[in-house]
Amino acid sequence: MRNLVKYVGIGLLVMGLAACDDKDTNATAQGSVAESNATGNPVNLLDGKLSFSLPADMTDQSGKLGTQANNMHVWSDATGQKAVIVIMGDDPKEDLAVLAKRLEDQQRSRDPQLQVVTNKAIELKGHKMQQLDSIISAKGQTAYSSVILGNVGNQLLTMQITLPADDQQKAQTTAENIINTLVIQ
């Protein structure tokens, strides 16, 4: 459980940094339709047990963040405002809804203005998951965060998608497009 909290904390740190990097998020709004389609980069992890697709402008940043664990993978765009973090951790043997609620509480303790968009159970191609979507604010900027929790074998999958929230509908659509490509075997 400590590892999950540590990795979620790292994810929140990345999300917070993306939200407060003082860059003009309007400069990244080029190619809006192509950007929202998550068909650019196919990703396979765990010897093909986990796969998904990312927008073409997102590249693998794993190993470039200093203290990188083998079970954590990071992709981002050139600005760092869009990021996807995938963490494979030990199965905590707790219900996914309980873990998502705990994550929501941790986010709220860091950002009292946190807006929870949804915290719901979902099913992706036969696999039960929990989805926590929220909007965080830092230094006048906002970020849309979608966190997916689920079990892959005997491990806990945590996938965090962080996008600029200038256009919440676009951010939500982009996150959903990535989530809908998720395949667990």
Swiss-Prot record:
Disruption phenotype: Disruption of the gene leads to phage C1 adsorption defect. Mutation does not impair vitamin B12 utilization. Mutant is resistant to phage C6. Null mutant is not viable when grown at low temperatures, conditions which impact membrane fluidity. Cells lacking both yciB and dcrB display pleiotropic defects, including morphological changes, elevated amounts of lipopolysaccharide, membrane vesiculation, reduced proton motive force, accumulation of outer membrane proteins at the inner membrane, and dynamic shrinking and extension of the cytoplasmic membrane accompanied by lysis and cell death. Pfam families: DcrB (PF08786). One of its GO terms (cellular component) is plasma membrane. A lipid is attached at C20 (N-palmitoyl cysteine). It comes from the Bacteria. Residues 1-19 form the signal peptide. It is a lipid-anchor. InterPro entries: DcrB (IPR046406), DcrB/EagT6 (IPR014894). Keywords: Cell membrane, Lipoprotein, Membrane, Palmitate, Signal. PROSITE patterns: PROKAR_LIPOPROTEIN. A lipid is attached at C20 (S-diacylglycerol cysteine). It is found in: Cell membrane. Belongs to the DcrB family. Plays a role in cell envelope biogenesis, maintenance of cell envelope integrity and membrane homeostasis. Essential for lipoprotein maturation under conditions where membrane fluidity may be altered. This is Inner membrane lipoprotein DcrB. It comes from Escherichia coli (strain K12).
